[in-house]
Amino acid sequence: MNDMERHRLDRVAEGMRPSARFTGRWLGVGLAGWLVVAALAAWDRVGQMARADDYDLAIASLQQTEESNASNQRAVEAARQLQGARPAVLLRVLEGMKRATPVGRNYLSGVAGTLFQRDSIYLRSQLESFLLDTTQDGEARYLVFEWLTEGQEALRDQMLDGFRDDPSLELRYAAIGRAIDRLDKNPELAVLRKLLDQSRHPSQIETLAKKLKESGETVDQAKVFGFLMTWDVIGPFDNHEQKHFHTVYPVERDLLDKPFDPSQKYSGKSGEVGWQSITTEEATGIVDLAESFNKEKGAIVYARTVFRCEQPQEVEVRLGCINANKLWVNGQEVFTHEVYHAGMSIDQYIGSVKMKAGDNEIVLKICQNEQTESWAQRWQFQLRISDATGKAVLAQNR
């Protein structure tokens, strides 16, 4: 036990016997004195209840923090208030991460770290229970895992073995990463297949797919991810000076309001345009519109496909796109991003959708600007369907 831990235990022990210092003082006071003691105790309980309410309000304030100066100022004050809380509040702060905004989550994790450094010795068993509670926030559980296993590699390895199928993406990533690091030079195919099935992070999926291929195994990487490979596309339509991101062209109105007609023609940027079907062969699922539309600039293309479900289900639509984009599913807007050439990555934009049984129509509007720099020539997207953990959900009509 180090000096800090001993000091904390001393503080706990001191806090458990506060009346020892005052026993003699009250011995001869009589009934009136005991009434005063009772009143003070009652006031203390009321004070604790008031502080508990204040802490809950502070946590709620942090949960709602947005990226604005006023919101951040309120968050700083709430965080300062929580940093003086009693040990048990740490668990409530961790629980609060589940319903927090991304900014609020950062504040809450910072407060939790401060409280842990101060009070962890009192709460280890409760933190262990929190870690194993899969209904809690995945990032919060990973924080607790890091705290509890710091400097204890054997314990870390032992615990990670149980997290390869965990709903916490952070814990799962750490567990799969450790398993990959410990693979033999010639790992068994069954082991690689199992790890690939358990993996959710794109980099780990790519690593395991490569190892399987090196071992002679055929891997459909696009299928593992759940990329949609075949699309009906039409364009180009005008986007001169980026003015038409919000323009509802007749094709857009028809896509959202009418059954799809592949023979329909429309007036495009430079004349009449019609639908064409394209299928990407890329393992990354990238659909290259620049190639299909002769590197047109200041232009818009619409893409649509059908995702068939056996039964209704909640899914996530995950788009990677370096251009401005809008996405609809069954005529309902899922998200919109008017951003050009700010980077592209798998799962860049994620929207939750309730798919119906049968055919579900997915529509994209992909807008290219008129920049001439070499890095601004890409006009492409990749889209996949997954569950909430990132595991591919495959269409019946794939």
PLM regions and their residue ranges:
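N-terminal secretory signal peptides that target proteins for export/translocation
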Residues: M1-R25
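Amphipathic alpha-helical scaffolding segments comprising HEAT/armadillo-like alpha-solenoid repeats
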Residues: M49, D53-T65, R86-M97, S120-L132, ...
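Short inter-helical turns and helix N-cap capping residues of alpha-solenoid HEAT/ARM repeat scaffolds
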Residues: A70-S71, A100-T101, Q136-D137, P167-S168, ...
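Structural detector for internal amphipathic alpha-helices that build alpha-solenoid repeat scaffolds
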Residues: Q73-A85, E95, N106-R118, S129, ...
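Accessory carbohydrate-binding/adhesion or oligomerization-edge regions at the termini
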Residues: D197-I286, K365-R398
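Beta-strand-rich interaction surfaces with strong enrichment in secreted/lumenal proteins
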Residues: A290-K295, R304-F307, I350-K354
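Aromatic-lined ligand-binding clefts that engage carbohydrates, nucleic acids, or primary amines
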Residues: C309, E314-W328, I362
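Beta-strand-rich ligand-recognition modules
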Residues: V329-W379
